[in-house]
């Protein structure tokens, strides 16, 4: 998923503090709106608790207060990726080969922006998703949003 310049800057800024607390920074989303939201996804082998999210929120807030990279009012949310985990990097897609994924593209392919299928392969920055038995290849830069699709 292509990150905006702000999201790239924020990722660089908060990766070290998150990792210093013993967590993996899975990714971030900055959602602009009437009430903008900075959403941070963290993970660890032991799982994530509410206290873990609070600790990361406190640490990240301190960094953001000093650096002040966001010019508008926003809410900070810290959470685990969850069952419908967002995918941000080629490594994330590689980790979940064989899993169902929902993809929203920035620029339509075959007149479609929304796709759902099974992650088949990752080759550099190209992601292959099998949709209705046919392989579709998407450039990571063209993926606006992607999430795993949980099955219950």
Swiss-Prot record:
Disulfide bonds: none annotated. Its main location: cytoplasm. Keywords: Cytoplasm, Ribosome biogenesis. Pfam families: DUF150_C, RimP_N. It comes from the Bacteria. It is found in: Cytoplasm. Required for maturation of 30S ribosomal subunits. HAMAP family: RimP. Belongs to the RimP family. This is Ribosome maturation factor RimP. It comes from Sodalis glossinidius (strain morsitans). The gene is rimP.
